[in-house]
């Protein structure tokens, strides 16, 4: 059900991933057959999950961690669902930096808490709602979802390309709080 893999990347791969400069506030699309351009793309392709490609995003510091579901977050914009008919199977989280205290991944459906540890890859069924426990310090993770069918909101994404998109859930959250 939940998979945890510690020391997922080699020391060299981890160093490369933590030293690249990317747009952290964007969703990164990496097509399954694309040529990796950096360590983030290599991380995504190393997971080897089924799908046309994957979306990945950096979680630096959630302002107000809330229980959420990644399918809804990734496929809803302006109140409209762009959910594909064939859904991903799992959510992946890769931890780059662990906080001083707290920051556990909480999955209420199965009464599970997973501690954030640097260089840890975690995956769980995508339908599970989850959130991050409050924490102190710096916590950085990368969320990754492999799509067997691309949501129509991600225009021009395909198995051969690499693109960046705005974070739909941030735009949706702003719209719902105004």
Residue ranges and their predicted role:
Residues 1-121, 127-178:
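Fe(II)/2-oxoglutarate oxygenase catalytic core
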């Amino acid at each position: 059900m939940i998979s945890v893999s510690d020391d997922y990347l080699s020391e060299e791969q981890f160093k490369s991933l933590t030293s690249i400069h990317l747009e952290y506030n964007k969703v990164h699309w990496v097509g399954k057959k694309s040529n990796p351009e950096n360590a983030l793309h290599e991380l995504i392709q190393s997971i080897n999950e089924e799908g046309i490609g994957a979306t990945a995003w950096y979680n630096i510091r959630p302002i107000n961690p809330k229980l959420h579901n990644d399918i809804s977050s990734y496929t809803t914009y302006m109140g409209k669902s762009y959910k594909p008919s064939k859904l991903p199977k799992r959510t992946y989280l890769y931890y780059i930096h662990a906080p001083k205290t707290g920051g556990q991944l909480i999955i209420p459906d199965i009464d599970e808490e997973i501690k954030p540890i640097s260089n840890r890859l975690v995956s769980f069924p995508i339908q599970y709602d989850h959130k991050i426990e409050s924490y102190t310090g710096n916590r950085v993770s990368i969320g990754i979802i492999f799509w067997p069918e691309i949501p129509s909101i991600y225009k021009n994404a395909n198995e051969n390309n690499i693109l960046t998109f705005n974070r739909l859930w941030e735009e949706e959250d702003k719209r719902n709080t105004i």
